[in-house]
Amino acid sequence: MLFDCDALSPEQIRIISGHSAITFMATMENGLLRPLERPRLDYLEEDLPEILKYKGKTSATFTRAMINVALSASAFQFAKQPLTVLDPICGKGTTAFCALQRGMNAAGVDIDTGALKESADYFERYLKYHGLKHSMKKVSETVGKTSVPVTKFVFAGSKEDWQANNNRMFNLYQADTALTENLFRKNRTHLIVGDLPYGIQHAPVSGSRTESFTSLLNRVLPSWFNALLPGGAIALSFNTLTLPTQKVQDCLRSAGFELCEGPGFTGYRHEVEQAVVRDAVFAVRPANASGN
């Protein structure tokens, strides 16, 4: 990527350094490249979202891009405190691991017990392998008449961070994603980033019946809206062959979100494989929006 600009401020260099696919930064002077020092933004090693392999895994690079774009759309891009990223359909946790690697707090909600266990087991092994101070506990939270199992991690990226109480949190909730607003009523999230189910083998289920993708969105988006802080942003990727972009946009508008449009927020449609043509949309919860 090449662009003309005035001299970059340290804050601008920091933001560009967080690009999802960056390997090198330089300025061009008299036809020569002068390397720019990249500030280290990582809280954990870059391999965290890469090691766990499974069929259907979303690219960590694409996931980081979604987080970055959502952050730029939100009111929290320049916040100094660690933000929280929620994936309300988290599966085995790629979104969460990308967020944790960058020093954010992360939370995931999913109904799949096996996927959540694999995610938690992997993260615990990762922390132990790297000798990182941490605690892990399994608790249960009650939502109405529903008992929700929760796995909670508190950890630090270094011994010094642990001693200074500069810790991060990672929570996994085994629940129907429609309960998200109840789970986060007291601690709303800054960003929601999720990869919607792609095809019939991943079709959403409501109760004992298979649910259409549009029905799923109409059922859960109001809950996600209420779990998000005013000024927060949502990023969703999906297979356009089973869920057209226009339908996703319409569902977001109906739930109260304000769509992000224009350069940087559109043009993400691309082929992943024969049966998957992926796109992404971005929206915000307006700062003055009403909600629970």
Predicted feature residues:
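Non-catalytic accessory regions of SAM-dependent methyltransferases
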Residues: M1-D6
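Class I S-adenosyl-L-methionine-dependent methyltransferase catalytic core
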Residues: A7-E11, G18-S20, T27-L86, C90-N292
